[in-house]
Amino acid sequence: ASGCLGYHLDCMEHLGGGHNINQTKLFELALNNGFDPRTQKQLGPKTGDPRTFTSFDQVMDAYYKQLEYFVPVMHKVKMLSLATEITDGPMSGLRCAMQYEDCIREGLTPKEGGARYPEGRTSWLGSRGMVDTADSMAAIKKLVFDEKKVTMEQLLDACAKNWEGYEDLHQMCLNSPKYGNDEDYVDDIYDELSTKVPEIMQRWIDPITGKKPMLFIGAAAGHIALGKALGALPNGRLAGSPTCDAACSVMPGMD
């Protein structure tokens, strides 16, 4: 896996196009049985009402099922984008080809194999919002299942109301274990995600290169747009606010 910065040989290797998945959005869908509170639409599969869950494992399973559903959808979008690039004709990759000496010499665009190292033609998949997802899972595990200080009903209602009227619970969630502070409680959850999520996302093979896509775990400036698509989260984050930036940054103010 790579973070926000991918390393490539200058003017010799080209990384193919890719798409991103907002992991935190998938987790939000899992907490709402596949229903999106923001658009008021059933976007994902019905993975169970979390209010009826009796273990944290059920929460994780619901999230993984959402991911398994949306990964093929993302790949279909990728193929549609590629089809558009192909129908655009030879001009579609000309600007990029002008940056590669090998492409100029061979008269081929990077996607046609003009770059010196064609391995770079593989697609990439971006896994965004991993830190917020892990932090939110840790809050649920600690407060709902381990310590039983709140019910899932109370926590989900607090998120739906953007913590209004739930100020004490909001502070409890903000003070729950946060990734990046050397706390095994949440780091172990992130470790599981960083293993399981790539395994699910890389089940797909690029039909053009015949290779598994390269996985990026990051956000870059995308954390602002990602946050606008989200409601409040169990980690204490407010609705519409940015998610954690970069690849592995701690929640702002929590390191």
List where the protein language model places each region.
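Conserved catalytic cores of very large enzyme subunits
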Residues: A1-D255
